[in-house]
Amino acid sequence: MSSATLKDVQFIPNAKSGMVSGLLLMPASAKALLVLAHGAGAGMRHKFMQECAAKLAEGGIATLRYQFPYMEKRIKRPDSESMLTDTVRAAVAVAKKNAGGLPLFAGGKSMGGRMTSLAAAKEPLDGVRGLIYFGFPLHAMGKPGAERGDHLAEIKLPMLFLQGSRDGLADLKLLKPLCKKLGKAVELFVIAGGDHSFHMLKSAKRSDDQALSDAVKKTVAWIKKNSGL
C-alpha cells in the first residue's frame, strides 16, 4: 500500500443525481484499472471494499471505487435502476480519463456488480474489456430463480463470477449452468465455504481474509489474462 496513491474524485452521473464521490487507488506498477461499485447496504468505504481495493493494489490492479447517489446522500433506499446504471456509466468514463491507457475492467460487490452488468447489457461500457462480480445476486434470499441473470446473454465481454458456496443470493445449482450457457469467456470461481461476502464459518480452516485474498488472487490473474499481459 505504501507504493499506491489514493486520489479523491467527484463526478455528476446525470442531471438529477447531484455530485457523487469516488476513490482512485493507483499502485505505482499498475497493470490495469477496475471500476468497483459497492453493494446495496454499504458504500465505497466499507471494510470489504477497502480491503478488496488494497489487495488488488498489491497485485498491481488500480481501482476506482465510487458512491451511488443514494449512498452519497445517506439515504437507505437505493436509487432507480436507471440512476444506478447511469452512475456506472459515468464512473467508467471517469476511470477511463484517469487510467492513463491502462486496460479497463468494471464490476462490483453484489448490487454494484449487477448494475454494472445491466449497464453493459443495455449499451457497451466504453473501453471496458471485461466484467467482474464479487457475489452476483442472482435471486432474493430464499427465493431461488435465475431471471435476474437473463440480461447477461446480451453482454459480449469476458465475465468473472466470484461466488461463495454458501451464498444465499446465488444458488450454485442455478449459477453454474447459467455461466456454462454464457460461453467459454465466462468463468465461475467458487470460494468454498464462503457466504455472499465470502465470510467463513468459525469451523472453517481458513479465515475471511484468506477467502478474500483467494478471490482477489483469482481476479488479478483473470484481469492479466484478459489484458493480454
Q: Language-model features: where?
A:
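Gly/Ala-rich beta-loop-alpha elbow adjacent to hydrolase catalytic centers
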Residues: 108-116
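Short beta-strand/loop motif that positions the catalytic acidic residue
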Residues: 155-156, 161-163, 167
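Catalytic histidine neighborhood in serine/cysteine hydrolases
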Residues: 181-200
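Serine-hydrolase catalytic machinery in alpha/beta-hydrolase-like enzymes
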Residues: 10-104, 198-208, 228
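A conserved short beta-strand
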Residues: 126-138
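Conserved alpha/beta-hydrolase "acid-adjacent" motif
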Residues: 168-174
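Catalytic active-site module of serine/aspartate enzymes centered on a nucleophile-bearing elbow/loop
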Residues: 203-229
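Short beta-strand immediately N-terminal to the catalytic nucleophile in serine-hydrolase-like folds
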Residues: 105-108, 134
